[in-house]
Curated annotation (Swiss-Prot):
TM region(s), chain numbering: 40-60, 124-140, 152-165, 207-227, 278-294
Primary role: Photosystem II (PSII) is a light-driven water:plastoquinone oxidoreductase that uses light energy to abstract electrons from H(2)O, generating O(2) and a proton gradient subsequently used for ATP formation. It consists of a core antenna complex that captures photons, and an electron transfer chain that converts photonic excitation into a charge separation. The D1/D2 (PsbA/PsbD) reaction center heterodimer binds P680, the primary electron donor of PSII as well as several subsequent electron acceptors. D2 is needed for assembly of a stable PSII complex.
Species this chain originates from: Chlorella vulgaris
Compartment(s): Plastid, Chloroplast thylakoid membrane
Name of the molecule in the record: Photosystem II D2 protein
GO molecular function ontology, one term from the record: oxygen evolving activity
Subunit structure: PSII is composed of 1 copy each of membrane proteins PsbA, PsbB, PsbC, PsbD, PsbE, PsbF, PsbH, PsbI, PsbJ, PsbK, PsbL, PsbM, PsbT, PsbX, PsbY, PsbZ, Psb30/Ycf12, at least 3 peripheral proteins of the oxygen-evolving complex and a large number of cofactors. It forms dimeric complexes.
Amino acid sequence: MTIAIGKTQEKRGLFDVVDDWLRRDRFVFVGWSGLLLFPTAYLALGGWFTGTTFVTSWYTHGLATSYLEGCNFLTAAVSTPANSMGHSLLFLWGPEAQGDFTRWCQLGGLWTFVALHGSFALIGFMLRQFEIARSVKIRPYNAIAFSAPISVFVSVFLIYPLGQSGWFFAPSFGVAAIFRFILFFQGFHNWTLNPFHMMGVAGVLGAALLCAIHGATVENTLFEDGDGANTFRAFNPTQAEETYSMVTANRFWSQIFGVAFSNKRWLHFFMLFVPVTGLWMSAIGVVGLALNLRAYDFVSQEIRAAEDPEFETFYTKNILLNEGIRAWMAAQDQPHEKLVFPEEVLPRGNAL
């Protein structure tokens, strides 16, 4: 009789089986992060398409905001709940809608649905980048970079209205609706004169400049890209080896500016640092606005302009413009308040 001696196969638990299935190499990687990403992204996008197609904002804003009512892609939106709803999460089964889907849509329940599921979807996408980076053994800088737009989304759509009286003051999900919100930010918070906004603009525009310069420099310093006279005809996307000269690029920018990046790591870290830091600063600024912190105030100029009708600066002109925005938006944007302003409080002066 023959006796085989060997290790018995260990019994695999449910976690190991699920882990193998989730992290299997397939066309679309799922992963553990996919359990959060895919359902929430699907529901957020589905809620947005449903709202912009069918749901009116007549009951919350007195507006038409759906394709069904004649709006187009630029003017359709999923609008914020009514101001009377405060910070209620507006669950379909909650005391406001009481399980009535039509009533839930009328109250603005789709906005909280899209905002919360969208936030978790963005977080799931960042976790997906962490998970895949760990699987292929690279650094997680993509995920860290993606935290910047997440911080902006969360600060604008969630933290800002939490600091105000209700979800009503958050942006609605639509193109024209976002533009209205920008006007609101300027009129009520003087956002363009906020140093955190300035850092955000510098980050975004600086990143665009760096991206354009970097792409042009790489194209300019190609030394091996095929036999054709035209770069685009000669470029071979399957070519494995590097085809541009960092030394030549360094020499070029040293002649242009007198300084240049000495290595690729510092160059690309700088391209990462500029936009990400700018967006983080913008998010911090919006958190400040949630607490109604003010931007720069040049009170001495305002006092002098009030005393001397001939004295005016671009700052005092902008202050008058902000007063005009507030006077218009308070009545137009919050009709439920039934605000009526006497002529004495409306802005006047040669700025308008």
